[in-house]
């Protein structure tokens, strides 16, 4: 007898439909699985055989053939266990064929017959709904995640026996599984930071145009404290962004027990010992890395020169393309990576250069330390700002600082200006303006062109860093509500670029 079961596999954050065929026929007793399978999928036949036995069902002494369609896609992971069980049970007549129509089945099984959770349930359920599937059988621990997709019936099962009961028309009782993750209460605020007004201004500019930011300064100046508060001035995620971000966390296995889509923008702060694989993603079964987990949020790299050079250099392409593309023998995995890079570093090993009274480093050691950050990576950072040691009067002052909500309101207005301007384009923010459109959206007067020509030569700018200055100036103009870029906007944008040139030039 023949049966067909619908399931899915994750590739990147996309779900690809897979169909599990089962055929039970007379012949030499054999359990065979074909269809471009990884070792863990091939091993599932032993789990299936034993789990069914421990559930009370002995497979007949017949030839059982399982085929996975399409054959050109490598099948990986343990989520195929439950669909194989369903296909076999249907083929031997334990469950009716009609019960599996328009139904997706996914889940791992233990030898006892219990159903275990799998990663990527959210994109799987969302994708099969678009294909007309009306119900899904998923592991009980994935219930809350699956139910985030509306207008599709979800059956969360804890065992093979429960799945058989449901497929044979039995009553389904919804479960209360664990405790849902509570919404995070925001405790950080820009009003916590005393002084550092130039730094806070740079943060607002960076967020307003979605520009990358580098803070350079001595230890204890507030670089990390400032970076941690940047997500509090970012606008809320829209519904599409919430779903996309939630899919990334679902695939990475960090989304279970949530009762709603992710609403807060992520803030990821990997340690400087992180590997390339941990940063950009990968692995035997590829998973998103830190740059994808920071999608639509902030990726904070503290002590930037302490990262391995080949690790941070790998950021260059994702920073431009806003996605990560991992090419493997069994396919290409694409993960979104549209983040704001916020980096912090000391200007030397001891941290106090150019204060020669405190700095203990030699000229050679300063040069070695500062040059761990390559020029191509610096060119991709729009704003560089010096974070000086805060004065005692500012630290101990009673002046009330501006709160995050006030700054965020201004940022939302600037974002609205950009989205309206670029509504017919395939980009939304000033930082994303392609080189071919710079002249159109960042137009300068004749005098401004002469000024920028002088700056271009003085600072020895590259074409990319020159364009970064113009994009930041465009953001400053939007913040002031002016249609044209003014001289003051260009001057401020040049200041943000001049700081990195000063540190790197002085180290030579």
List where the protein language model places each region.
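Catalytic P-loop NTPase motifs of RecA-like helicase/translocase cores
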Residues: 112, 301-308, 351
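P-loop NTPase nucleotide-binding/switch module
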Residues: 169-205, 209, 236-291
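Walker B catalytic acidic pair
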Residues: 296, 302-303, 314
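Short beta-strand elements
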Residues: 18-24, 279, 382-386
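Peripheral, non-AAA+ core regions of ATP-driven protein-machinery
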Residues: 1-214, 218-221, 262, 465-466, ...
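Walker A/P-loop
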Residues: 215-256, 321
């Amino acid at each position: 007898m023949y049966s067909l079961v619908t399931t899915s596999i994750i590739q990147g954050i996309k779900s690809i439909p897979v169909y599990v065929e089962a055929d039970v026929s007379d012949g030499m007793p054999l359990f065979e699985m074909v269809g471009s399978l990884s070792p863990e999928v091939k091993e599932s036949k032993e789990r299936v055989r034993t789990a069914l036995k421990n559930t009370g069902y002995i497979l007949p002494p017949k030839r059982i053939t399982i085929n996975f369609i399409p054959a050109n896609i490598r099948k990986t992971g343990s989520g195929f266990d439950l669909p194989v069980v369903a296909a076999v049970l249907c083929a031997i007549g334990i469950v009716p064929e009609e019960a599996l129509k328009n139904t997706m089945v996914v889940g791992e099984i233990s030898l006892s017959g219990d159903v275990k959770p799998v990663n990527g349930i959210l994109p799987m359920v969302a994708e099969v709904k678009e294909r007309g599937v009306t119900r899904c059988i998923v592991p009980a621990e994935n219930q809350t995640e699956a139910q985030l997709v509306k207008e599709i019936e979800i059956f969360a099962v804890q065992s093979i026996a429960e799945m058989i009961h449901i497929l044979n028309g039995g009553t389904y009782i919804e479960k209360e599984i664990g405790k849902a993750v509570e919404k995070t209460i925001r405790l950080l605020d820009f009003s916590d930071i005393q002084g550092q007004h130039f730094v806070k201004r740079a943060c607002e500019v960076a967020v307003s145009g979605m520009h990358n930011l580098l803070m350079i300064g001595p230890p204890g100046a507030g670089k990390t404290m400032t970076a941690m508060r940047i997500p509090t001035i970012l606008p809320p995620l829209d519904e599409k962004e919430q779903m996309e971000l939630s899919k990334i966390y679902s695939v990475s296995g960090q989304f279970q027990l949530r009762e709603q889509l992710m609403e807060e923008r992520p803030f990821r702060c990997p340690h400087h010992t992180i590997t390339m694989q941990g940063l950009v993603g990968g692995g035997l079964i590829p998973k998103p890395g830190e740059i994808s987990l920071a999608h639509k949020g902030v990726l904070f790299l503290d002590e930037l020169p302490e990262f391995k050079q080949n690790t941070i250099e790998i950021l260059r392409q994702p920073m431009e393309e806003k996605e990560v593309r991992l090419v493997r023998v069994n396919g290409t995995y694409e993960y979104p990576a549209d983040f704001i890079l916020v980096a912090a570093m000391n200007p030397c090993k001891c941290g106090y250069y150019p204060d020669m009274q405190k700095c203990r480093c030699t000229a050679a050691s300063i040069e070695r330390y500062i040059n761990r950050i390559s020029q191509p990576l610096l060119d991709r950072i729009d704003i560089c700002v010096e974070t000086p040691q805060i004065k005692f009067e500012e630290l101990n002052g009673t002046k009330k600082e501006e709160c995050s909500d006030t700054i965020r309101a201004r940022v939302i207005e600037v974002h609205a200006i950009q989205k309206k301007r670029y509504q017919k384009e395939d980009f939304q923010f000033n930082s994303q303006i392609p080189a071919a459109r710079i002249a159109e959206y960042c137009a300068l007067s004749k005098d401004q062109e002469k000024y920028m020509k002088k700056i271009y030569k003085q600072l020895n700018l590259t074409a990319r860093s020159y364009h970064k200055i113009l994009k930041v100036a465009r953001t400053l103009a939007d913040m002031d509500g002016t249609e044209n870029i003014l001289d003051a906007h260009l001057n401020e944008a040049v200041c943000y670029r001049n700081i990195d040139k000063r540190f790197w030039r002085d180290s030579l």
